[in-house]
Design a protein with these regions (language model features):
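Active-site-adjacent structural segments surrounding the nucleophilic cysteine of cysteine proteases
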Residues: 1-59, 70-96, 116-139
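Predominantly the structural core of cysteine protease catalytic domains
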Residues: 2-9, 54, 64-68, 92-226, ...
Length: 283
């Protein structure tokens, strides 16, 4: 967003204690990678996305993008989940009823409790539940809740630090939804972010996004972050975060991040016949 206005994430109403208390008690930094790990999974060239436009729905987009990667890992198929649904369901957890943003805890808990709403129910190219763009007050038919309930997130896990995040992604567990400072740093022309600058009351804004992959550029590994302002930000909405950037960002009091995985399968959903290699073993 060019004017760095509010985009939908406010760290002041994030309940970190409840967010992390609901996470699986597991330390992904204790994994050690083994075998042939590819330079990237190529997620950015496969996943489909939309722009959030003027709605403060970035938290819903972060959760929907995360869910899309989880779904591909489980089924081998990319399906878009409705960001607006994830947004307003998350607001139910937060107790909010206006277009005023949502917490990461809200969208994660809602994805576990209410599920994610697939946009193309029949997977035939026709979107029964498309993103309503600027229509925050759009109301879904009754059957939407039952359809979403078929596809609930199974677990979340805290992933503090670059190593834990990278291991979670390279373990093919899922993707990582996050929120925090944004707007007062920009990726370079190649999409790379190296210097993190935290948001203050005088600069930038806050935003929710998702780490969906890793990528190796000139021998260096970066985390790939998908942004819901992809028409105006980074490499077609993706930025590549260096280890130093991620470690500095993790120290920002406004930043939260959790990995999510294991979406339940609905009728007609077919799991992959051969599970993707996990690339990791316990240390």
């Amino acid at each position: 967003v060019s004017d760095l206005t509010f985009t939908g994430y406010d760290p002041s109403f994030e309940d970190k204690e409840k967010l992390y208390a609901a996470c699986l008690d597991y330390d992904f930094s204790k994994f050690v990678c083994s075998g042939e790990i590819p330079e990237t999974r190529g997620i950015k060239d496969m996943m489909t996305r939309e722009d959030q436009y003027r709605m403060n729905s970035c938290g819903g987009f972060g959760m929907a993008h995360t869910g899309q990667v989880c779904w591909w890992l489980q089924t081998g198929d990319f399906r878009e989940f409705n960001p607006h649904w994830a947004y307003i369901m998350g607001q139910q957890i937060d107790g909010r009823k206006t277009d005023s943003g949502v917490s990461i805890r809200g969208v994660v808990e809602a994805a576990k409790r209410f599920g994610l709403l697939v946009q193309d129910v029949e997977n035939d190219g026709k979107l029964e539940f498309s993103y309503p763009r600027d229509n925050y007050r759009f109301r879904y038919p009754k059957e939407a809740a039952a359809i979403a309930a078929q596809r609930k997130v199974g677990y979340s896990v805290a992933v503090p630090g670059f190593k834990a995040k990278l291991n979670f992604l390279q373990a093919n567990q899922g993707a990582i939804v996050n929120g925090g400072s944004w707007g007062n740093w920009k990726p370079g022309r190649d999409g790379i972010c190296r210097k993190f600058v935290r948001t203050t009351r005088y600069s930038g804004s806050y935003h929710a996004r998702a780490y969906v992959d890793w990528i190796t550029i000139r021998g260096e590994v970066f985390l790939v972050e998908a942004n819901s302002h992809f028409r105006t930000f980074g490499d077609n909405g993706f930025s590549y975060h260096s280890e130093e950037f991620v470690e500095a960002q993790d120290k920002d009091p406004a930043f939260v991040a959790v990995g999510v995985s294991d979406i339940s399968l609905g009728p007609g959903d077919v799991p992959k016949q051969r599970a993707p290699r996990r690339y990791v073993k316990l240390s």
